[in-house]
UniProtKB/Swiss-Prot annotation:
It is a peripheral membrane protein. It comes from Homo sapiens (Human). Changing residue 163 to Y: In HH1; phenotype consistent with Kallmann syndrome. Has a dual branch-promoting and guidance activity, which may play an important role in the patterning of mitral and tufted cell collaterals to the olfactory cortex. Chemoattractant for fetal olfactory epithelial cells. This is Anosmin-1. Keywords: Cell adhesion, Cell membrane, Chemotaxis, Disease variant, Disulfide bond, Glycoprotein, Heparin-binding, Hypogonadotropic hypogonadism, Kallmann syndrome, Membrane, Protease inhibitor, Repeat, Secreted, Serine protease inhibitor, Signal. Residues 127-176 form the WAP domain. Interacts with FGFR1; this interaction does not interfere with FGF2-binding to FGFR1. Binds heparin. Heparin may promote or interfere with ANOS1-FGFR1-FGF2 complex formation depending on the sequential order of its binding to the various constituents. For instance, heparin-ANOS1 interaction favors subsequent binding to pre-existing binary FGFR1-FGF2 complex, while heparin-FGF2 complex does not interact with ANOS1-FGFR1. Glycans are attached at residues 71, 209, 300, 470, 553, 564.
Length: 680
């Protein structure tokens, strides 16, 4: 660094496909360390790519850089026509090893893409080939000299070892000249300054730079919740900045978190690694109370045989509070025949864990107006922090009818909500029906193309959030890039809930990613439909053990409201054949029809599946078609596999004759038609 140069600080945020969840202790720790290493390696190689771009510019216009070598050089490169083309692949968050550089660069720079192409090829190379040179074959000794093919590429070797020839085979060997031309590590002492603006400034200092190439610093952090710092409970290391200065200012520092940082000095030749983790830092600010629960709504209502009513209330969990929610308090009270509410002392109350977003209220009186209040509670030491209360008004028995629900907070006004099944907007992402082809379970995800003319690529990322057999440990996220408005996801696992994010790629700005969830069916559901044999094996290649448990008394009821039909499907379980603990239920429903359906979207969803927790025996399906046969399958899920399916066919009721004439009045007269539920 040259002192006294007024260079601007540039922070290039890297869009990593890393999860920020806490690491699990135990068998998953090794997998977590491998994930940390792979993510860190990717960040370092992208910094090497950026350093190469700066090195090329120093060569071309060395006179300019004699007094301007490091400070501000990334800023300069970003604003330089040729250098910015070179930097573009270095910022790419997708896996370039799976894509052609030409398809990446030419849409961005149709006329002159040479700088982008050469930079992309360099990045692909260093992502596959580790730094350092292989020793001469005759130098190999011990196991390294064995005449075996123990590796094919460098990434198959641990640590800094490379896949090298020993004259009669290939083995993992320590390279020679590992640090030739590589800058020294920064000094391990990092200094923290909490600014009045709320930002955190992190500073470090460099040792003598033994390289003439520009040095780029990669800054990573990890954190844990709690009163005390803990490396065992910390997140993965995440790259938060890439800069040519010896400082960085971070804006997203949250109270109640213990942060650790580390820094690596990188040039085109590589790095000596990251500094040791810094001392822990925690903001001096006190954490805020949790936000009020959002989108409180009624998800299900069932009339029991004794005349009482059971309802399910759901809400959206907060995305990232200062402190995780410890528990939720739920209060409910009622009034009869439009009279005043019951006294406060007769209010009912219960609590639910902070990670849950639903509660079941049982033994409600029919035809009563209820008020439900919800409040989030967190703890900071001995201090209890409470959110504002949110309330929901509904009428029992007819709760799923088209009666408007009123939701309000103590600090705000009243907000009108449509019922749960009517509130769903048109989703930005759609998922087709899973299908089995070429020996793989696949699914098509599609979306509406953005109107922004600068967007011609989409970064897609997908991973299993939960599986029926609890085999997601170590599962890595997959990602891809496409120019189309769809992508086919391949090699999926059976009986898993997947999350998919799609992010438009803009040349000079960061776009918001949209997300969608879908559930893959069990293998047995496709086995009977496929013309070719489908091998229903576990992930380790072993046939899943037989499960005898089977749902019983599968029944359905339908509520007709104007032109909408909502189905409530329920079942019971007999414990006699349950020799293994249940992990949930796999529910699959589909229309039984040979008619083609008119739909503007490709691969319209005719069959759908959902995985429910083991304590949920009811599924609500809105927007069913009138007078239509539906086939419902319910299976028990256990760690050993799926049980036999209980199958039943139901026909939805017809719409009342006047529904078509009344449909334009449904918002004006919501109580005009209230049929009793039809039961099967």
């Amino acid at each position: 660094m040259v002192p006294g140069v007024p260079g601007a600080v540039l922070t290039l945020c890297l869009w990593l496909a890393a999860s920020s969840g806490c690491l699990a202790a135990g068998p998953g720790a090794a997998a977590a360390r491998r994930l940390d290493e792979s993510l860190s390696a990717g960040s370092v190689q992208r910094a090497r790519c950026a350093s190469r771009c700066l090195s090329l510019q120093i060569t071309r216009i060395s006179a300019f850089f004699q007094h301007f070598q490091n400070n501000g050089s990334l800023v300069w490169c970003q604003n330089h026509k040729q250098c910015s083309k070179c930097l573009e692949p270095c910022k790419e968050s997708g896996d370039l090893r799976k894509h052609q550089c030409q398809s990446f660069c030419e849409p961005l720079f149709p006329k002159k893409s040479y700088e982008c192409l050469t930079s992309c090829e360099f990045l692909k190379y260093i992502l596959l080939v580790k730094q350092g040179d292989c020793p001469a074959p005759e130098k190999a000794s011990g196991f390294a000299a064995a005449c075996v093919e123990s590796c094919e590429v460098d990434n198959e070797c641990s640590g800094v070892k490379k896949c090298c020839s020993n004259g009669c085979g290939h083995t993992c060997q320590v390279p020679k000249t590992l640090y030739k031309g590589v800058p020294l590590k920064p000094r391990k002492e990092l200094r923290f300054t909490e600014l009045q603006s709320g930002q955190l400034e992190v500073k470090w200092s460099s040792k003598f730079n033994i390289s003439i190439e520009p040095v780029i610093y990669v800054v990573q952090r990890r954190w844990n919740y709690g009163i005390h710092p803990s490396e065992d409970d910390a997140t993965h290391w995440q790259t938060v900045a890439q800069t040519t200065d010896e400082r960085v200012q971070l804006t997203d520092i949250r109270p109640s978190r213990w942060y650790q940082f580390r820094v690596a000095a990188v040039n085109v030749h590589g790095t000596r690694g990251f500094t040791a983790p810094s001392k822990h830092f925690r903001s001096s600010k006190d954490p805020s109370a949790p936000p009020a629960p959002a989108n409180l709504r009624l998800a299900n209502s069932t009339v029991n045989s004794d005349g009482s009513v059971t309802v399910t209330i759901v809400w959206d969990l907060p995305e990232e509070p200062d402190i995780p929610v410890h528990h939720y308090k739920v209060f409910w009270s009622w009034m009869v025949s439009s009279k005043s509410l019951v006294p406060t002392k007769k209010k009912r109350r219960k609590t639910t864990d902070g990670f849950q977003n639903s509660v079941i209220l049982e033994k409600l009186q029919p035809d009563c107006d209820y008020v439900v209040e919800l409040q989030a509670i967190t703890y900071w030491g001995q201090t209890r922090l409470k959110s504002a209360k949110v309330s929901l008004h509904f009428t029992s028995t007819h709760a799923t009818n088209n009666k408007e629900q009123l939701v309000k907070t103590r600090k705000g006004g009243i907000q009108t909500q449509l019922p749960f099944q009517r509130r769903r907007p048109t989703r930005p992402l759609e998922v087709g029906a899973p299908f089995y082809q070429d020996g793989q379970l696949q699914v098509k995800v599609y979306w509406k193309k953005t109107e922004d003319p600068t967007v011609n690529r989409y970064h897609v990322r997908w991973f299993p959030e939960a599986c029926a057999h609890n085999r997601t440990t170590g599962s890595e996220a997959s990602s891809g890039m496409t120019h189309e408005n769809y992508i086919i996801l391949q090699d999926l696992s059976f009986s898993c809930k997947y999350k998919v994010t799609v992010q438009p790629i803009r040349p000079k700005s960061h776009s918001k990613a949209e997300a969608v969830f879908f559930t893959t069916p069990p293998c047995s559901a496709l086995k009977g439909k496929s013309h070719k044999p489908v091998g229903c094996l576990g992930e380790a290649g072993h046939v899943l053990s037989k499960v005898l448990a089977k749902p019983e008394n599968l029944s359905a009821s339908f509520i007709v409201q104007d032109v909408n039909i909502t189905g409530h499907f329920s079942w019971k379980m007999a414990k006699a054949n349950l020799y293994q603990p249940m992990t949930g239920f796999q529910v699959t429903w589909a229309e039984v029809t040979t008619e083609s359906r008119q739909n503007s979207l490709p691969n319209s969803i005719i069959s759908q599946s959902q995985i429910l927790p083991s304590d949920h025996y009811v599924l609500t399906v809105p927007n069913l078609r009138p007078s239509t046969l539906y086939r419902l399958e319910v299976q028990v899920l256990t760690p050993g596999g799926e049980g036999p399916a209980t199958i039943k066919t139901f026909r939805t009721p017809e719409l009342p004759p006047s529904s078509a004439h009344r449909s334009h009045l449904k918002h004006r007269h919501p109580h005009h038609y209230k049929p009793s539920p039809e039961r099967y």
